[in-house]
């Protein structure tokens, strides 16, 4: 196998090209997307697996912050979902997660923060521009700006379908291939905006704030703040969102509506004999952004596809692994809503929902469930606190980092 075609230029297309061009310089990679390509991306809040994916492929934290306009993400703060606000920090082991949560609460950053299991916020449009330049180093990459309607139009053995919510290729060969999750997580839209970032919003974490008919994300990028009100489109949330922005002193930025086609493919792969097609990213699966799983599921899918291509797993195993990871995450996300205190049609839907709890997957260990279901806080030892004596307020740390200082 030496020929791979990546079709589509959303974030999943960019990451697929980056992965296969880097890992397999002996392969011929063809990247095909239309001249009028439009991406859905907003400010992305990622998880450590995405940061590790990028770093393994040569993109350093310094480049993410300095060149892509990114910022630190140590975890997520959940406000007003239940009667007590809580944090869901990153960290490989309990001790590290406890320390990261402590750092989040004080918003002071130690000098060795890059050695922790952390991630980043970044603007996907900036990532795309950065990668456009990065890709110039690849001798094995051919870019064709055109519209492709059939895999028969391209002379390749493997096709990676990165066509987003249109799901243009794999689903062409299956009837009713998309499995909806509206019975568990019915959010299917977001009102989004960008604004200048005030100092009180410059945090080293994403904030998710529960509202009457959904929740609002605050993603503090390096130079701007992105916000989005995630909801089901049967509810009109515009006025509530505008009132929130006014209360927070964020003005009246222009709002943009993003529709989300949630669910997953039942089959992510089709073998046509001389041609093989696999879906990655939004064309494969999407839930909703509350735990920043969009790019995680993309990089998870790319890595499992690599195993399929090189026959380390079978097609059935590939489908099973991807679907299991997705299905557990759906339950994990639904659990965020199940114990909300609000009494209206939106929140009451979740109270009666059957959710399989404490089921682990690659993304979320039992500790993550404890944070969400019990709002559990791990204790920090005095020895750990001593490590943070010289920690700096995040805004100062970020400015120093940009200047190459500690």
Specify the residue positions occupied by each region the protein language model found.
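Conserved FAD/dinucleotide-binding core of flavoprotein oxidoreductases
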Residues: 210-263, 285-296, 311
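Long, low-complexity C-terminal extensions of enzymes
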Residues: 307-406
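Glycine-rich FAD pyrophosphate-binding loop
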Residues: 21-42
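Beta1/beta-strand and adjacent pyrophosphate-binding region of the FAD-binding site
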Residues: 1-10
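Predominantly flavin-linked oxidoreductase catalytic cores and closely associated redox partners
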Residues: 119-241, 302
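N-terminal Rossmann-fold NAD(P) dinucleotide-binding loop
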Residues: 13
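Conserved mid-domain beta->alpha element of the FAD-binding
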Residues: 267-330
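Dinucleotide-binding Rossmann-like beta1-alpha1 core, especially the glycine-rich loop
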Residues: 38-110
